[in-house]
């Protein structure tokens, strides 16, 4: 009964409780994405304690990212069929439990299961539903709202990176993981903020969502009709998968996800390998995080301006391409003074395109499909996130340096940008001939009928 009395908004309110949703999503990104990034600070500790090579140790970070993205559709399902609050609170419990259990690890395989799978599953239940909720509350200021919400990743990295390093020094890596587990339990509080909202667009797309369930005593014919309606609703929920624009976007995410992960995993180990101290290496992650915030908010604000709103797609692909270009230069930066500009540039463009991912996705599929679409988008990140750090680690073990690993990441992101650019150009070329036909059809044509001349104007 409570759900039936929920107020129906014609359009997103663009404010009000929406700002509390932004704050909640902000802290969700702190507890999920920032904590995931800071796992790379444990890399050297795990490698030293368990006496393993780069590739095997890198699987920990890969499994966390992969589980988060692979299970994203589960988060979308729970959000769509129960509520966003239920999904985030449940995810907070699982993620916190995974980190606490990881503090008792006796092998890398144990960490694969607890820190990788269990924590990653918890993050998945929180991440995509929280991001989708922001899109339901904002339309005119959507990019700015997402910029603020997604900046939690950068702010969290800036604060947590040195704190985690300090916790490791004071309490060992076991104590640091235990404290992180308590910190991540705050996701349950974030979930309580996610007040549901019903939009007119939702009721138009999914009118059958709240139909009462048929009793088992109903006739087989009625049950068959109900089953067909349920299948129809499910099909409508994912009809965007057949859109050519979404297919191109989905393919580009595969290359983007492969390229963006290794720099975060190997920035600290690479810095240590060229003589940078542990504190300075952690500070590089902090710089990257704080500039990431600037990229989130400024790019979100700028692309909300009227003159750039229609060009968000181009802004997104430019940011991705420049981020890849930064990776190509990383192998020649061999001191702290040169690595600082890298952290600034890479962090800014990373924040820029990350803030636009849900915006671009929403522009393609619509607000009513955003939660399901984000589940698919993050699902596509799973395999690249799983494979890219171990592949990069294998390249480091094989070649003896980080050059090949960073070059592969850079070229992958640049290819993603080129793919999106080519799709944009092809789409524009396809539209031009149609425009030419319409213009030529406006010319008056003479038609001879019984000796009279009639002038027919083509109706466009």
From Swiss-Prot:
TM stretches of this protein: 11-31, 58-78, 86-106, 115-135, 148-168, 177-197, 246-266, 282-302, 329-349, 354-374, 376-396, 406-426
Ranges of the Cytoplasmic topological domain: 1-10, 427-460
One GO term describing the cellular component: basolateral plasma membrane
Keywords of the record: Cell membrane, Membrane, Transmembrane, Transmembrane helix
Alphabetical list of Gene3D superfamilies matching this protein: MFS general substrate transporter like domains
Keyword hit for Cell inner membrane: no
Membrane topology classification: Multi-pass membrane protein
Superkingdom assignment: Eukaryota
Pfam families per record: MFS_1
Function: Functions as a transporter for creatine and as well for its precursor guanidinoacetate. Transport of creatine and GAA is independent of resting membrane potential and extracellular Na(+), Cl(-), or pH. Contributes to the process of creatine biosynthesis and distribution.
Family: Belongs to the major facilitator superfamily. Monocarboxylate porter (TC 2.A.1.13) family.
Record localization: Cell membrane; Basolateral cell membrane
A GO biological process held by the record: creatinine metabolic process
Organism encoding this protein: Xenopus laevis (African clawed frog)
InterPro entries in the record: MFS, MFS_dom, MFS_trans_sf, Proton-linked_MCT
GO molecular function terms attached to this record: creatine transmembrane transporter activity; transmembrane transporter activity; uniporter activity
Entries under CDD domains matching the protein: MFS_MCT12
Protein name: Monocarboxylate transporter 12
Reaction(s) catalysed (UniProt annotation): creatine(in) = creatine(out); guanidinoacetate(in) = guanidinoacetate(out)
